[in-house]
Amino acid sequence: QLIERYWPDFQLLISKREHFLPHHVVREFDEYLECGRLENGFLRVRCEDCHLEHLVAFSCKRRGFCPSCGARRMAETAALLVDDVLPHKPIRQWVLSFPYPLRFLLANNPQVLSKVLGIVNRVISTHLIKKAGVKATQAQTGAVTLIQRFGSALNLNVHFHMLFIDGAYQEKHNGQLRFHRVDAPTASELNTLVAAISQRVVGHLERQGLLVRDDESSYLALDLQDDDAMIQLQEHSITYRIAVGPQQGRKVFTLQTIPSWEDDDFGTNQVGKIAGFSLHAGVATKTRERRKLERLCRYISRPAVSEKRLALTSQGKV
């Protein structure tokens, strides 16, 4: 209802500024508005025994923000990871978030995002292998990463959710593998890791000419289109500000509530921080805790929009 009501007005505001939205964004909204509606097509399912018929509306199958399709994909992803991908070993979640300027850069440059993920993966993998006491030439670890682009307030916040095996495999001379489990990272180790990650990421961006540092400050060197509406929208979203309309530039009003069970379970204070980089590693599952692991997989693969968290006040505010 909210999208259907305000999407045309939003497009009109953008066009009046002589700005444009990328085609994939417009398509995401338009197909979402057709999702689950019988008038846009359906399948007729009929039971062979009782002859009961049921109509199933076509879905948009988009990956942006459709709550229905996103929830279905969340369940499928979690089942796949637990049943077919993640081994029956201890698993730890590592969550890395970035400074505001880098969130903007990563949101607009998938090639850079891929390179940064590779840097982060190597830093954590090397740490696990060394801590396991195994030679690098004989050791392997593993991880699955889900990149989330949203925060709890639907703000733009590119960050990594990485599920690492909590240890390393050692390949013996006979070809067999032996697993070496490691202890949870200490506060000192987290600070060391996040410092290494920040230095290597910044160094890579400088070599690519995307980040310029002088004696006083650092800034991004980006070639941006002035008529691209997404640039302005992303800049405001990252800093929790209203992007268009009469209240443009104002901070979004937010309420701090009692943490949900997800926040309580998956948001501990085991964290290392430096210069806007933040590395969490306080959540882990034991070998036999497959149900907890599935809950964790559902949590990190959840869609951006949760209809349970949306409500309209009597004044019409969201």
Across the structure, where does each feature detected by a protein language model lie?
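Beta->alpha loop/short-helix hinge microenvironment recognizer with preference
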Residues: 1-318
